[in-house]
Curated annotation (Swiss-Prot):
Mutagenesis or variant effect for residue 159 to Q: Loss of twitching motility but no change in unipolar localization
Protein name: Type IV pilus ATPase PilU
Subunit structure: Homohexamer. Interacts with PilT.
Annotated phenotype, changing residue 163 to Q: Loss of twitching motility but no change in unipolar localization
SUPFAM superfamilies reported in the protein's UniProt record: P-loop containing nucleoside triphosphate hydrolases
Gene it is expressed from: pilU
A cellular-component GO term for this protein: cytoplasm
Domain of life (superkingdom): Bacteria
Lineage summary: Bacteria, Pseudomonadati, Pseudomonadota, Gammaproteobacteria, Pseudomonadales
GO molecular function: ATP binding; ATP hydrolysis activity; endodeoxyribonuclease activity, producing 5'-phosphomonoesters
CDD domains named among the record's database cross-references: PilT
Family: Belongs to the GSP E family.
Organism: Pseudomonas aeruginosa (strain ATCC 15692 / DSM 22644 / CIP 104116 / JCM 14847 / LMG 12228 / 1C / PRS 101 / PAO1)
UniProt domain comment: The N-terminal region is responsible for proper localization to the piliated pole.
Length: 382
């Protein structure tokens, strides 16, 4: 199949990634699942020809020298793609990631309403966490899009790579890509405050220096949005503190208690029909009580606080999974498979079912059954 047809098929099917590797057919990832798009495996020669064919001369020289090359390509009438070319077992391969220009909305993603409030907040640090491929970048793009439509100001993003292209709407949106527009996150962040930002988005916090910048931006009155690899809010705080030496831990806990706005953790769970995935969201808000626990480093006390603070907009993964299961959005098996505590969620579902049954029983007490002529089934409540 021609390479351009592969790209077009990827877009039509809603694929996120296209894999070109010798020995297997061209494959794409759709809704988190990798599937072949042809039956014929690619030969080493076909793979090499395809990979080198999307590069310019400079990129070919860089690839020959470094055995790695990252760049973007545009296909007219199809879209833009981020390319990562590499060698594996002395053979050439590449993965293409589709760069989205259609930013999904918070409503389309069915994300909690509290994210709208967080998107418009004036200052503070909001951290999205989750494993690779859990939709952090998509949710963050939706928040940026909401801010862009409903506010004014200057939004600066530093990403590696840029995954969504934002158009200027209410805000001016400056998007800088590491490796193309700047040498590193650290270099870009050092100069960001000179560019009069209102919102700063850091594609990924990978180091102590980047974390220092994120906290400093919040301290100086900016809204800083960032992503971090962690499974839930508690793990995110533990990961942050371990960026720093022990003699700084007390100060870091204090800084987080004063400047953290929220930690939003995310998973993706398949829908019952297998045709899509639903975001499952955990939300920790830095309320006065949460700030006090963070300042003391009592991370283990945050989960119980989240459980009893749903009216303020907080929720745990297990509470979110319970809601999605009761709404028929996910299956029982998938809910348990993604739970922080399968036993707790199982009990929550059991108690919820018993509560519903008790409520129905109380409603029907004292009612009598009467068969009427227009009720052939004989089961109308009077």
């Amino acid at each position: 199949m021609e390479f351009e047809k592969l790209l077009r098929l990827m877009v039509e099917k809603g694929g996120s990634d296209l894999f070109i590797t010798a020995g297997v057919p061209p494959s794409m990832k759709v809704n988190g699942r990798v599937m072949p798009v042809t039956k014929t495996p690619l030969s080493p020669e076909q793979t090499r020809e395809t990979v080198l064919g999307v590069m310019n001369e400079q990129q070919r020289r860089d690839f020959a020298e470094n055995h790695e090359c990252n760049f973007a390509i545009s296909a007219r009438g199809i879209g833009r793609f981020r390319v990562s070319a590499f060698y594996q077992r002395n053979l050439v391969g590449m993965v293409l990631r589709r760069i989205e220009t259609n930013i999904p909305t918070l409503e389309e993603l069915k994300l909690p309403e509290i994210l709208k409030k967080l998107a418009l907040t004036k200052r503070g640090l909001v951290i999205f966490v989750g494993a690779t491929g859990t939709g952090k970048s998509t949710s963050l793009a939706a928040m940026i899009g909401y801010r862009n439509k409903n506010s004014t100001g200057h939004i600066i993003s530093i990403e590696d790579p840029i995954e969504y292209i934002h158009q200027h709407q209410g805000c001016i949106v400056t998007q800088r890509e590491v490796g193309l527009d700047t040498d590193s996150f650290e270099v870009a962040l050092k100069n960001t405050l000179r560019q009069a930002p209102d919102v700063i988005m850091i594609g990924e916090v990978r180091s102590r220096e980047t974390m220092d910048h994120a906290v400093a931006f919040a301290e100086t009155g900016h809204l800083c949005l960032a992503t971090l690899h962690a499974n839930n809010a508690n793990q995110a705080l533990e990961r942050i503190i371990h960026f720093f030496p022990a003699d700084r831990h007390g100060q870091v806990w204090m800084d987080l208690s004063l400047n953290l706005k929220a930690i939003v953790a995310q998973q993706l769970v398949p829908t019952p029909d297998g045709k899509g995935r639903r975001a499952v969201i955990e939300v920790l808000l830095n309320t006065p009580l949460a700030a006090d626990l963070i300042r003391k480093g009592e991370v283990h006390e945050l989960k119980p606080l989240m459980k009893r603070s749903t009216e303020q907009g907080m929720q745990t993964f297990d509470q979110a999974l319970y809601q999605l299961y009761t709404q028929g959005e996910i299956t029982y098996e998938d809910a348990l498979a993604h739970a922080d505590s399968a036993n707790d969620l199982r009990l929550m579902i059991k108690l919820g079912s018993e509560s519903d049954a008790d409520h129905l029983s109380s409603l029907t007490q004292g009612l009598s059954l009467e068969i009427t002529d227009d009720d052939p089934a004989g089961r109308r409540f009077r």
